[in-house]
Amino acid sequence: QGVVWVGCLPKTACPPTSIDVTEMAKIAQHNPFYQEGQRIAKNHRGHAIVAVKGVSSAVERFRVLTKILAAVASSYNAVAIYQGASQLFYSRDFLLEQARLLQEGYLPVQAWIYFGFYSHENAFWCYTQGMGQFGREELEIASDRHTPRQLHEALIQFAYHYLSSHRQWNDGELVVLNEELSLIVHPRYSPTLKSDTLLLSFDS
């Protein structure tokens, strides 16, 4: 099974060519939308390493990375993409769909940011890991009235809005994302993520 490994970032040296398959399988297990991921990771047979250097802007660097990954994954006939530093493992088809969105002018945040889930005190939570790569706080959202998928979709929309702008929000500020979705922002320190975050709640 071919895997494209995103092995290094600007201003760093490329790592050895081996992959920790056990660690990769653990990361693959945490993608609930890629059911075949863990099996593919465990059966890994070969890989290509992709790195981007010399691009100063984080958003622009990830734009370039996505374009290169799509080209390599297509020509290399890869089945999955592994970004260990970002806790991401997803399918080739998913990458190509995200690259198509990029061509249409959208930021493919799901190919750049990890979105995780957990439950606590009768509520579902969704959170990000990877916003720090862009100099932004991580995001959290919680609700006892919405499904995990609804939380996921809301957080994706806010992450896209956050990376597309240079805005900073005050505590309690309302962010209108579209006619159907408005979120209230609460900056805080998250004991779960152990970092400063923006905790989001639904307006209604």
Regions found by a protein language model. Give the residues of each.
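Long, low-complexity, Ser/Thr/Gly/Pro-rich intrinsically disordered segments that act as flexible linkers
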Residues: 1-23, 39-42, 167-180, 186-188
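Internal, hydrophobic cores of structured domains that mediate oligomerization or house catalytic pockets
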Residues: 11-112
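Aromatic/basic-lined ligand-recognition segments
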Residues: 84-204
